[in-house]
Every structure is written in structure tokens, then in C-alpha cells.
């Protein structure tokens, strides 16, 4: 009988056994001198007593192969394997991308190749008694073979039948439409009624959609103090980084939604992870690459992003950084984009192109300036629309419709955000690429227009929050008061 070297690996053991059988078949072919009677006796002996493979060590001592388990084999390879450290693509200490949870698993026995006489002569009664227990355990261990979609449907249906949550009445639901639970003391018109025939405007449940957005935006905000918690990162570095991101966004002709999502993803990542200075550009590139795939119809290739970095990073590094960034953020890109809130407010502004263009410029100030980190997007949109209407000289600057379709923001709620925007306009130009972008003709030269107005407004000494400029009604109460304001502005 040929000797087989002892091994604990299942695959190697089975390969060795196949070699032994192959050698036996070759030896039987070569021994042509054996008679037919002897050949029949040998085959009968093989059928009556199955062949036993003995395991012989190098010392010549025969050992019987014991029962092996998959768990023992895997544990042996885990203990013998050398630990490999995966370096974070965006800097920091060596660590895996995500900690894997160790789940203790019961070892699965492999059928032994040695069939002892005692095992072959087991009684039929004991096997019948164990069949019931085996079937019961198999039904618990083996997962259902139903399709996943059918399983999810059945589980959700059973859950709904058990809960039977009572639905609120119409009067109760109307109170949850607004983010702020306060008494509505302003006049407003139902402008969504005009869109009942337009299915794309979803006027039936537009209030529920924005009510969900108002709750979601607070959860997706970054840490407003993360710039001061990191020892290497400074506000000036973020300003340069976002200005470069605006340049790349304009070069690729992407949607505004992609830029807002990229900055939000970048800020949220740096709120929980420390990024080295030489990896900031890689982080911004990966953030815009991820945002474009989420917002755009046709996203640029990763090679274009790597080329825009002047060869600092390869496409493989951009993809690796994207994977790590999404892993840290739990793949949560459900960010309520500020452009949705701006379009909602524009309905109360009669979709005026000028105020909307100026509002987009003022809204992008909130992503390039670090002072706006942590402010709600809906608040920034309402403040941008207020300041845009004030620049264009629209009266009233803020009325009941604008309060309602902005989410319930009054001037007192927007005071801090409006002051920060105004301070940015009167300050020297800090973000060159951002200023050049909105100095173009297609953007109505919004950056130049707003800065010139801010300097004149500051020189006049007027109040940004003049009570005569706003009302809780749809129009100003007194027409004579409106004429006085217009005459005063003309004299100045």
C-alpha cells in the first residue's frame, strides 16, 4: 500500500488520495499476468471491505486519520498568517478600512475517509431516532430558499398587520408640515394648487417631502468646530481647498447639486477623521467624484479627475479614497440639497430669474466660507433669498408667502446668517476662482453686482433689517409707506 504524507488541509488531502487511486489503477493495468479468477476475487474483496487509507509519518509509525473540521483548518491558517496592515488612503495610522466583527461559528465536520468496522455496523434504530433531531436542526440552520424580495414582502406585511398603527387625521397631519411648531400668524396663498395638473410637481405630497427634508438636514450637518479640533488643518486651508473645488466643478460643467453635496461629504468626513495636509486635494477630488456620480446623468471619468490634479494622484488612488470615505460615512449620501429649498422659495418669488441667480451666488458663499459650517441649508437659502430681493429693491422684501415656503423663517431667525453674508460681501476678495465664476455674463455678474451694492449700502448707514421692508401679509399694509421708502432710496 503506498504511503501518504499526513496533512491537515482538506484540499491537499483529497488531491493526495486521488494520486493514490491513480497509481493503483496504473498498477492494475500493468499487471496483465493476473488471471481472471484472481481479478474477480480482488474486486469482491474491495466491495466487501472498502479500502482504508493509512497515514504514515516520516518515522514509519502508522496513524489513523482523525475527524477534521473546517473550523480547525481555517483557524490554523489564521494563526499562521502574517498580519498585513492596510494604510489609510487619506493619511493617519495604519488600520483596516473597517473593523470586521468576529462571529463564532460551529465547526462543520468533514466526512472521514477511514470507515471503521464499528461505524459501518451502526444500528438502524439509532439512525432513525437521530433523523428527527437532524431535520429539526437543519430547518433552523439552513436559510429559507425563497427569493429575497418575497421574504421582505412577507415580513413587512406581517409587521404591518401586527402593528396596525392608527393614521392621523387630516387636521393633525397639517400641523406637522412645518419644521417650526408655532402659531401661524401670517397670510399665505396655496401656490401648489396651481400645479395639480402637473404630475412632475407632485403637489399632492410636496408638503410631506419638505417636512422630511427639514428633519433630515439637521442629521446631515457636519461638526461646526471640526476645524479647530484638528491640529494640522486650519480654516485658511479649507478656503483654498474649496476654491480649487469650485474651479474643478466649473471646468467639468457639473450641476450645482454636485458641488453642494461634495462639500457636505468632505466636511462630514473631516468631522470624524484626521486628514493629512498632503491628502486634502485627494479628499476633495474623491468627494466631487462621488457627488457627480450621485447627481449627474453623465459623470466624468475618474481619469479626468486624476488629470485635473496635475498628476498628483492616480485614478486608482482616487477610487481607493472614495471607498474609504464612503465606508467612514456608512454610504449615507442622503443629503437634502440646498437647491431644493431655493427652488421651493422661488415659487413664492414668481420664479424670478434675477433674484434666483443672485440667490445662488449668495448661497454658494455658505460653502466657501467656513463660518457657515453647521448652519441648516434651509436657513441659508432663506437668507440668500432675502438678501437677493433686498439688492434688487423688491418690496416687500419678506412677506407671508416667503415665510411659509421657506419653512417658517422670519427675519429674526435669519439675522445671524444675513449678517455673515453681508460681511463676506464687504470684505476683500478671498476666493478668486469663486469670484471669477460669478463675474461671468451668464451669471449676470452677480459677484460684482453684490459687492458694489454692499459697499454702497454700508456707506449709506441703512439697516439691513428695517421693519418697514417686511410684513406678515402678502403686501405692505400702507401704499404711502411703500412710496416713502422708494423716494428715500432714490434720494440716497
Curated annotation (Swiss-Prot):
Residues 1-176 are annotated as: Disordered. Residues 34-58, 111-135 have a biased composition (Low complexity). It comes from the Eukaryota. Pfam families: Cyclin_C, Cyclin_N. PROSITE patterns: CYCLINS (PS00292). SMART domains: CYCLIN, Cyclin_C. GO terms for molecular function: cyclin-dependent protein serine/threonine kinase activator activity. The keyword Cell division applies. Keywords: Cell cycle, Cell division, Cyclin, Mitosis. Residues 23-33, 59-83 have a biased composition (Polar residues). GO terms for biological process: cell division; filamentous growth; meiotic nuclear division; mitotic cell cycle phase transition; negative regulation of ascospore formation; positive regulation of G2/M transition of mitotic cell cycle; positive regulation of mitotic sister chromatid biorientation. GO terms for cellular component: chromatin; cytoplasm; meiotic spindle; mitotic spindle midzone; new mitotic spindle pole body; nuclear periphery; nucleolar peripheral inclusion body; nucleolus. Essential for the control of the cell cycle at the G2/M (mitosis) transition. Interacts with the CDC2 protein kinase to form MPF. G2/M cyclins accumulate steadily during G2 and are abruptly destroyed at mitosis. Belongs to the cyclin family. Cyclin AB subfamily. PANTHER family: CYCLINS. This is G2/mitotic-specific cyclin CYB1. It comes from Candida albicans. The lineage of its organism: Eukaryota, Fungi, Dikarya, Ascomycota, Saccharomycotina. The gene is CYB1.
Amino acid at each position: 500500500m503506498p504511503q501518504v504524507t499526513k496533512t491537515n488541509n482538506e484540499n491537499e488531502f483529497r488531491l493526495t488520495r486521488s494520486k493514490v487511486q491513480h497509481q493503483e489503477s496504473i498498477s492494475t493495468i500493468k499487471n496483465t499476468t493476473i488471471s481472471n479468477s484472481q481479478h474477480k476475487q480482488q474486486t469482491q474483496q474491495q466491495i466487501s471491505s472498502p479500502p482504508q487509507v493509512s497515514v504514515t509519518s516520516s518515522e514509519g509509525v502508522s496513524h489513523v486519520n482523525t475527524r477534521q473540521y473546517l473550523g480547525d483548518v481555517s483557524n490554523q491558517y489564521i494563526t499562521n498568517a502574517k498580519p498585513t496592515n492596510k494604510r489609510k488612503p487619506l493619511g493617519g495610522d495604519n488600520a483596516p478600512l473597517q473593523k470586521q466583527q468576529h462571529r463564532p461559528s460551529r465547526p462543520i465536520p468533514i466526512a472521514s475517509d477511514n470507515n471503521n468496522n464499528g461505524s459501518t455496523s451502526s444500528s438502524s434504530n439509532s439512525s432513525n431516532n437521530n433523523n428527527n433531531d437532524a431535520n429539526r436542526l437543519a430547518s433552523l440552520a439552513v436559510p429559507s430558499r425563497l427569493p429575497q424580495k418575497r421574504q421582505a414582502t412577507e415580513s413587512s406585511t406581517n409587521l404591518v398587520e401586527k402593528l396596525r398603527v392608527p393614521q392621523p387625521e387630516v387636521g393633525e397631519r397639517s400641523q406637522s408640515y412645518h419644521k417650526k411648531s408655532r402659531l401661524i400668524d401670517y397670510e399665505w396663498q396655496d401656490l401648489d394648487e396651481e400645479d395639480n395638473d402637473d404630475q412632475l410637481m407632485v403637489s399632492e405630497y410636496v408638503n410631506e417631502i419638505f417636512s422630511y427634508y427639514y428633519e433630515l438636514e439637521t442629521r446631515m450637518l457636519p461638526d461646526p468646530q471640526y476645524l479647530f479640533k484638528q491640529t494640522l488643518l486650519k480654516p485658511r486651508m479649507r478656503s483654498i481647498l474649496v476654491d480649487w473645488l469650485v474651479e474643478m466643478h466649473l471646468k467639468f460643467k457639473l450641476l450645482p447639486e454636485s458641488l453642494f453635496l461634495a462639500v457636505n461629504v468632505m466636511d462630514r468626513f473631516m468631522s470624524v477623521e484626521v486628514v493629512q495636509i498632503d491628502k486634502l486635494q485627494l479628499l476633495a477630488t474623491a468627494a466631487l467624484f462621488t457627488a457627480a456620480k450621485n447627481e449627474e446623468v453623465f459623470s466624468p471619468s475618474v481619469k479626468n479627475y486624476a488629470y485635473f490634479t496635475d498628476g498628483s494622484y492616480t485614478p486608482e488612488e482616487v477610487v481607493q479614497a472614495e471607498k474609504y470615505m464612503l465606508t467612514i460615512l456608512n454610504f449615507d449620501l442622503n443629503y437634502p440639497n440646498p437647491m431644493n429649498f431655493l427652488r421651493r422659495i422661488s415659487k413664492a418669488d414668481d420664479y424670478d430669474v434675477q433674484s434666483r441667480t443672485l440667490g445662488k451666488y449668495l448661497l454658494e458663499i455658505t460653502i466657501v466660507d467656513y463660518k457657515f459650517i453647521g448652519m441648516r441649508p434651509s436657513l441659508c437659502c432663506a437668507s440668500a433669498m432675502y438678501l437677493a430681493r433686498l439688492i434688487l429693491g423688491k418690496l416687500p422684501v419678506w412677506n407671508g408667502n416667503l415665510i411659509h415656503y421657506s419653512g417658517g423663517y422670519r427675519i429674526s431667525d435669519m439675522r445671524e446668517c444675513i449678517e455673515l453674508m453681508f460681511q463676506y460681501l464687504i470684505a476683500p476678495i478671498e476666493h478668486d476662482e469663486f469670484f471669477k465664476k460669478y463675474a461671468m455674463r451668464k451669471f449676470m455678474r452677480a459677484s460684482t453686482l453684490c459687492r458694489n451694492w454692499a459697499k454702497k449700502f454700508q456707506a449709506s448707514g441703512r439697516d439691513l433689517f428695517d421693519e418697514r421692508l417686511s410684513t406678515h401679509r402678502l403686501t405692505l399694509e400702507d401704499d404711502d409707506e411703500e412710496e416713502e421708502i422708494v423716494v428715500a432710496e432714490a434720494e440716497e
